Amino acid sequence: MNVVLKQRIPLKIKRMGINGEGIGFYKKTLIFVPGALKGEEVFCQISSVRRNFAEAKLLKINKKSKNRVEPPCSIYKECGGCQIMHLQYDKQLEFKTDVIRQALMKFKPEGYENYEIRKTIGMSEPEHYRAKLQFQVRSFGGNVKAGLYAQGTHRLIDIKDCLVQDSLTQEMINRVAELLGKYKLPIYNERKIAGVRTVMIRRAQASGEVQLIFITSKRLDFDDVVIELVREFPELKTVAVNINASKTSDIYGQITEVIWGQESINEEVLDYGFSLSPRAFYQLNPKQTQILYSEAVKALDVKEDDDLIDAYCGVGTIGLAFAGKVKSVRGMDIIPEAIQDAKENALYMGFTNTHYEAGKAEDIIPRWYSEGFRANALIVDPPRTGLDDKLLNTILKMPPEKMVYVSCNTSTLARDLVTLTKVYHVHYIQSVDMFPHTARTEAVVKLQRKE
């Protein structure tokens, strides 16, 4: 290794890495510099030395990129949640398309050099797009603060005005923190596993309805807090409590109870309505979700005699968009509340050709196949960990004719394509910017079974 810890070096940034950092070479050593942009010449200090690379802190930019902008967020550097806010937005979209190429070059699925990778679809107004927040709460001398941990630490950043967060949910979390302090509710700390740990607030774009979850290590009396919140925020329709007494980093425990209001809120996507219970997964960016799901529908190109499996179905949002166009839809999800929502949503919409089960896709789909069911269309929308090996093997043994992979992690997507391209051709990859100003992107992949 040609560098040592705390060494200060000049560096030319050759490209950007998948996490939004600048990458350069110093005496043939690969150096990652968060905050640096392609084409810049910087002065940096080595902060970490690994076997094959080093990380450095940006000290000074000697030659700025013409694509650099001043981040409009006052806590941009301190927070670290928006890794590329200093990059002009149209160039962010180019970067996200390139991230897909980088992932493919690393894993090299069959034929990757010839894949059609379409330009990333961005937002016309890439601010205040997050309709859901999950803020940690901590008490500092009796003063309750809510926010996120600084990147790579357990140091809470008090966030009062987040540029990418929905304005109403931000206003509500600010008030929640005040009320938790006012009524002296116990607040979690890592020495005493007791009190309120996290607050989740989600607003439905279509209805404007809001739901709130207090994640706490024990049962508490939230009556006074709820009374004030309901009086001040007429949009608030659901208040729930989730009990998580574990010492793990898991946000949620197994028990969720609605303590005030209705069981769910109402949302819409692709011109149909559905319900969201407090624990159910739904995309963070409702406006771009319309585009993401439209691209998925277009890519799968179903026929009326198709039997469709919607793996990782959540509340049924993607699958229900197909239900009126196919013979049947089957879906599964690991969250029982989401499956209950999916069943109720299908019933509400009048569909009788749907079937939903709670459980893992890698367990349920092989069982369905062993029972004689066959799907000729498959859509998967897995978590960031990608597809389970067991599910991949099932797909290889009995591949549906057509498949769409909706990915939230380009690395696991490229990894899974190594397996999937044994039986499928990749027609194209369409990325959609669901998280402006961050290094993350989502992608819709159209796959067709090989003849």
UniProtKB/Swiss-Prot annotation:
Enzyme Commission code: 2.1.1.-
Active site: C408
PROSITE patterns attached to this UniProt entry: SAM_MT_RNA_M5U, TRAM, TRMA_1, TRMA_2
Keyword Membrane annotated: no
Gene3D superfamilies cross-referenced by the UniProt entry: 2.40.50.1070, Nucleic acid-binding proteins, Vaccinia Virus protein VP39
Ranges for domain TRAM: 2-60
Binding site for S-adenosyl-L-methionine: Q283, Y312, D333, D381
Annotated [4Fe-4S] cluster binding sites: C73, C79, C82, C162
GO biological process: one example: rRNA base methylation
Residues spanning the signal sequence: none
Keywords carried by this UniProt record: 4Fe-4S, Iron, Iron-sulfur, Metal-binding, Methyltransferase, S-adenosyl-L-methionine, Transferase
PANTHER family given in the database record: PTHR11061:SF45, RNA M5U METHYLTRANSFERASE
Family recorded in the similarity comment: Belongs to the class I-like SAM-binding methyltransferase superfamily. RNA M5U methyltransferase family.
Protein name per the record: Uncharacterized RNA methyltransferase SAG0413
Organism the protein comes from: Streptococcus agalactiae serotype V (strain ATCC BAA-611 / 2603 V/R)
